[in-house]
Design a protein with these regions (language model features):
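Long amphipathic alpha-helical coiled-coil segments
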Residues: 131-163, 245
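Hydrophobic packing segments in regular secondary structure
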Residues: 1-41, 168-245, 361-365, 369-373, ...
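...with weaker cross-activation on analogous glycine-rich loops/strands in unrelated enzymes
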Residues: 276-330
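Short coil/loop "hinge" linkers that interrupt or connect long alpha-helical coiled-coils or helical hairpins
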Residues: 86-140, 195-224
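Extended alpha-helical stalk/coiled-coil segments
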Residues: 51, 58, 65, 72, ...
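Catalytic cysteine-centered active-site loop
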Residues: 249-297
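Long, contiguous alpha-helical "rod/stalk" segments
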Residues: 30-100, 158-165
Length: 388
């Protein structure tokens, strides 16, 4: 068995199998090599690798979003802490000035005796009122100083915790990135071990499976008996139009455009272009956006795939979606059943349907990127030029 294939067989994260560098004496026989497996087995293995990589990629995206939020929180706390410390310095300066004034004005005479001995008793009374106000000011300064020191201490603690959280998120992100890199290398290694004939057979098998899944999906009546296109909302129309204009751009994990996209990067960017902010990952989009029956789908709605909601696409109408499929592929139009459908969500549930609607015209390159998504390109791997 080649070293390349051995590494592929030992990919625990992708294949769910445990592999050690020194197998026990009674280890199970090695998995059959590519030349020994049927096209169906190869396609199943390859699709499992793709799904595993995409699932980890979406987890990475969620961590990236949390890390961005934590960086912003830490920066805000740092600014507030600097302001609080400046306020404490000012309060300490005021307190010192009042202390010096009080020391300089110290007298052994009681206020009553000072009033009796005053040349102008009324003026002495007025001065007493001024002094009382000054005393109140000193008390307020001391109170501000005490409160400011407490606030500065609290903010310093919060800033320290925010830094620790940011550091932990960055470490988690690196582990997830390394895992995606490994899973994408597994895809590359498997594909590089196949012959031209095997690759062609895989593409044909995938296209046949997709066509069969689409026929069964439409026959089930899941889309309400007819995949006819309903009019979208104005925002949905704008989001779909943006997605269609990205057809032909490469898939790249973690990418949010404008030169490359992953699946949820495309859906988020499309709806942002329409003026609505939606969550970054497919899992968050599924969890947080309004779910709708498939029978109510309209263009611009999001179709979510797989049991763990690890893939997402924009519904185009007529039983089709626009999606960024997976590494090695490009943004394209696909049958809605190209992957197992989990459900659908609507980013603008209160958006009124347009009175008149004309579907977007597909670019000429749409046909060139149709068909199977089998493939892999090193330029789409982690560490390649980042589009974000």
């Amino acid at each position: 068995m080649s070293a390349t294939l051995l590494r592929w067989v030992c990919t625990g994260a992708a294949l769910g199998a445990l592999c050690t560098t020194a197998p026990p004496a009674h280890a199970a026989p090695d998995a059959p090599g590519p030349e020994e497996r049927s096209v169906t087995q190869l396609l199943t293995d390859l699709q499992r690798l793709y799904r595993s990589a995409e699932e980890t990629s979406e987890t990475y995206n969620a961590t990236e979003e949390k890390l961005t939020e934590q960086r912003a929180r830490a920066a805000t706390l740092d600014r507030r802490l600097a302001k609080a410390r400046a306020s404490v310095r000012d309060s300490r300066s005021d307190a010192g000035r009042f202390a010096r004034q009080q020391y300089q004005a110290t007298s052994n005479l009681s206020p009553y005796m000072r009033l009796l001995l005053a040349r102008d008793p009324q003026r002495a009374l007025d001065q007493g009122q001024v002094l009382r106000r000054a005393a109140a000011g000193r008390a307020a300064t001391v109170e501000r100083l005490t409160g400011g020191e407490k606030k500065a201490g609290d903010l310093a603690g919060a800033a320290k915790r925010a830094l620790a959280a940011r550091t932990a998120l960055a470490a988690r992100q690196k582990k997830q990135r390394d895992r995606v890199e490994g899973q994408l290398r597994d895809v590359e290694q498997l594909l590089s071990s196949l012959t031209v004939e095997q690759l062609a057979a895989l593409r044909q098998a995938e296209e046949a499976d997709t066509a069969d899944a689409q026929r069964r999906f439409l026959a089930s009546g899941a889309l309400g008996g007819s995949p006819a296109t309903r009019p979208p909302s104005r925002q949905g129309d704008t989001a779909l139009d943006y997605a269609v204009r990205q057809i032909g751009r490469p898939y790249k994990w973690g990418a949010e455009g404008p030169k490359a996209f992953d699946c949820s990067g495309l859906t988020q960017r499309a709806w942002a272009h329409a003026g609505r902010r939606i969550p970054r990952t497919s899992q968050e989009q599924w969890a947080e956006l309004r779910r709708i029956p498939l029978s109510k789908l309209r263009p611009g709605d999001l179709v979510v795939y797989f049991r763990k909601a690890t893939h997402v696409a924009l519904y185009m109408g007529d039983g089709k979606v626009v999606q960024a499929p997976r590494p090695g592929a490009r943004v394209k139009v696909s049958p809605i059943a190209a992957n197992p459908v989990l459900g659908a969500v609507r980013p603008d549930p209160k958006g009124r349907a347009m009175d008149r609607y004309t579907p977007p015209k597909l670019p000429a390159k749409a046909k060139a990127v149709s068909g199977s998504d089998i493939g892999y390109d090193r330029s789409h791997a982690p560490g390649a030029t980042d589009s974000r």
